[in-house]
Amino acid sequence: MKSGIRNLTEGKIFSTLIRLALPLMGTSFLQMAYTLMAMSWVGRLGTTSHPEIATKSEAAIGAIGLLLWLTSSVAYLAMIGSEVAVGQSIGAKKMKRATVYASHSTTIAIVLSIIWVLILFTFAQPILSFFKLEADITADAVLYLRILTISLPFQFLSYNFTGIYNGAGRSIVPFRNNAAGLVLNMILDPILMFWMDMGLHGAAVGTVAAQLFVFSLFLYQVKFGSRILGNFKFFIKPKAIYLKRILFLGTPVSVMNSLYAIINMNLARIASIHGGHLGMMAQTTGGQIEAVTWNTSQGFSTALSAFVAQNYAANKIERGKKAYIYTIRVMLTLGVAVSICFILFGAQIFGIIVPEENAMKAGAEYLFVMGLVQIFMMFELTTQGMFNGIGRTIEPAVISITFNALRIPLAYYLASQMGVTGVWWAIAISTVCKGIILPTWFAIVYRRIKKKNPKPKVG
């Protein structure tokens, strides 16, 4: 290991991929565990005489969760750009260029975060009114969001540092930092919400404290610890050639995920119109439960992106293809197991988070439909990592944006015929389409790459 990086172009493929993916998956599962635990605490805010307090609070958290999803998607611009640009520079043995890319992506993250905070803080009320929730739920959500804006610049920087470390093959560092932050958040939530009697907004304060803590860990490691890439500068006057490359790599993924978040905001609005706050709660809380497969797939996708970036630059694309095959096998096994649990035990699983009869019934309907299509979702996300690694981020963006956008008119139509369940079926139908088309498209792209370079290095 040199300059805090790891060479992914040598060694056994599966073990190398697993060592890279496990910390990423660990971070994802810790994030999922925290989110579900936070929702579980919120789900217990109600009383026997007023159980609606819990479901209304969950709806408020759900609305905020969608905006945080959009926030993460915006932050992906710098994160993905740095991950691929740094990874490819390292694979090509051009360390100075990797350092320059790290400085540029960090500068982008700082500027983006300031703009985003100003937008969310200033327009919190009209943004959250979009979901058509009751006035008291919207008011709670507005205060919650404004508290969270304190931590967003630090969250953007942490995402950026995560991309840099992933590109350098050091995914264990973000895992440790995020794990520490999540553990702190888990401890703070019940203390702030119940012991200090801050209720729903105690969760927001806990999140702010945890994000500041995670950033401080990254800052220490970059400046005084591993000093990755020679202690690169955080804020510079950007040069067009590097800025363009990062934007080229990061923008499609960022736009894709941002549009995905916006589309889900529209779906939540439709669910709220046809199912009230219970409909929105079922979608947003159910989506967090569904994160067991989403986060696992995203972890492997990110690992593949870093793995393939280095091997593609080193003319060892066949190593990346083999890693993809291994990952698909893992996804298939996990997808079947999760689908069975969602289909057969949806109500019981949902009841762990919100132990209220109406909430359990609504949640079970959502998980049943989603359980039918988990494998297709995992195939799509895994294949995205392959495209990102070879620097072709546009293809998965086109497919994802197209079929996710089709969810809105389909949801309006099906909801008018079937009620709120029609929204779930609109999501499921588009998921199947993406899970079939994207891997097929990659197979075509891979054959073209092989024709251009018929004798790649095996490694």
Where are these regions (language model features)?
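Short runs within selected transmembrane alpha-helices of multi-pass transporters and secretion channels
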Residues: 79, 83, 147-166, 174-182, ...
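Short alpha-helical transmembrane segments in multi-pass integral membrane proteins
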Residues: 1-21, 86-151, 195-251, 308-373, ...
